[in-house]
Amino acid sequence: MNIQSILSDKIKQAMVIAGADQSCDALVRQSGKPQFGDYQANGIMAAAKKLGLNPREFAQKVLDNLQLSDIAEKLEIAGPGFINIFLNPTWLTTEISAALSHKNLGIQATNKQTVVIDYSSPNVAKEMHVGHLRSTIIGDAVARTLEFLGHNVIRANHVGDWGTQFGMLIAYLEKMQNEHASEMELQDLEAFYREAKKHYDEDEIFAEKARNYVVKLQSGDEYCRTMWKRLVDITMQQNQHNYNRLNVTLTEKDVMGESLYNPMLPSIVEDLKKQGLAVENDGALVVYLDEFKNKDGDPMGVIVQKKDGGFLYTTTDIAAAKYRYETLKANRALVFSDTRQSQHMQQAWLITRKAGYVPDSFSLEHKNFGMMLGKDGKPFKTRTGGTVKLADLLNEAIERATVLINEKNTNLSNDEKQAVIEAIGIGSVKYADLSKNRTTDYVFDWDNMLSFEGNTAPYMQYAYTRIRSIFNKTDINSTALLAAPLTIKDDKERTLAIKLLQFEEAVQTVGKEGTPHVLCAYLYELAGIFSSFYEHCPILNAENESIKLSRLKLALLTEKTLKQGLTLLGIKTVEKM
């Protein structure tokens, strides 16, 4: 249940009755200060200005036509024309009880869509590195969230599984097989790629064979396709190990690599020529876009086919957009890649639309993200300046979490301790990233992310475990608890109840904008509000049984909300810490 949406609809209806245009916006927002209510409608002044009316007089007209008696206990006009909304405690109790009994905490599926989410996208025959982390975990959090909201989500792992380098890789794989190299040697993909490149650069006979294999692979030669498939499978098996460690939902079934779109490319280029969009320039085929200018102020040229007949990433991305609309029947396609890809994606999609391959109703969204930086403010590297392998980063996270947990005086079994170490180690890396606005760069800092204070995974995981411990101290039957009446009298109870009912607002924002940090911020605020409630309002030692049960209901919904929210982020919780 989305309070903001409900209030927006009702206030807009009243604004229209009072004379505003149908396109008006109530601009309902959560209030920053209690004295200004729980929500504020800030759109009155703009509507009044259009009508040539006094804003406060128009605000009164809106109130006269506003039906909010069940939701709000008080409405007031403030300042030049804001409407402050104070929610009704009786309504809050009803909605809290409804959320507790609903499997999705009161969130109903509406306007179901098919959404393709393109994320992770590592390259074949190369190991995943830290540069793949953001796309993988941000994309996965959004995929989980959209599924939770009732949408049909199609995960598309757009792996780099095609290109001229595959002739070189197939030739080297063949050489290894002929020399009876063990399978283990293939497990070090970086070394495999490096050796293949070395042979290509230094051995002309090898290089010629590699070039021949490129031609054969592209023409569908069975032997080359088999060798190529083996390279893809070996790579994706290793990637799957990283995905499993990261608690990411991607599987081999989600692989939709560049090769998938290969058969489409010649006909797309031919069609772009027929439509007059692509023209020849120095042997290459180029689409000139008036919407983008080069340094001389002329329309920018985007190459869709090289002089040698080869296709480019732009051509593949045009085909991918077309495929996702025509074949996958998607309503939206979200691509999670770094900000440096923004112009490339916008150009590919502009050509896609100009060619009529997708309608305006099909939403193509580049969810760009910034870089992970070291403490020196430069791109995150190893001490020697090399690229950090993702597996090495996760290993270090586990090592640091092990030291952290061993320092704590815990009464956990070895299995319980290991579960906590895994949850905190991997969770810390993920949460540190997810809690930052994806469009900005952020500094990777082990000390901050492993802290039990602040907006971190350990703090959030501990907040959940702390609430679980309350229920471990009571033998109250869950059915009896759900049936018990809920009363909201204390201000701390009221604040907690409202924050709990704002869960859907945060989740809907993540689904719409692709911004998991909004959910992180919500969960952190919720944990802080619960902590204040817990200190101020005794639960197990409440003055009577009815207050105890009522507060336990608030605690139970907080526990469920924290767990569900962290699950959407792909962060594991533990029952004991």
UniProtKB/Swiss-Prot annotation:
Name of the top EC class for this enzyme: ligase
The UniProt entry's GO biological process terms, in alphabetical order, are: arginyl-tRNA aminoacylation
Motif 'HIGH' region, residue range(s) on this chain: 122-132
Q: What is its EC number?
A: 6.1.1.19
Q: List the disulfide bonds.
A: none
> What is one GO cellular-component annotation here?
cytoplasm
- Do you know which NCBIfam families this protein is assigned to? argS
Q: What is this protein called?
A: Arginine--tRNA ligase
Originating organism: Haemophilus influenzae (strain 86-028NP)
Identify the gene encoding this protein. argS
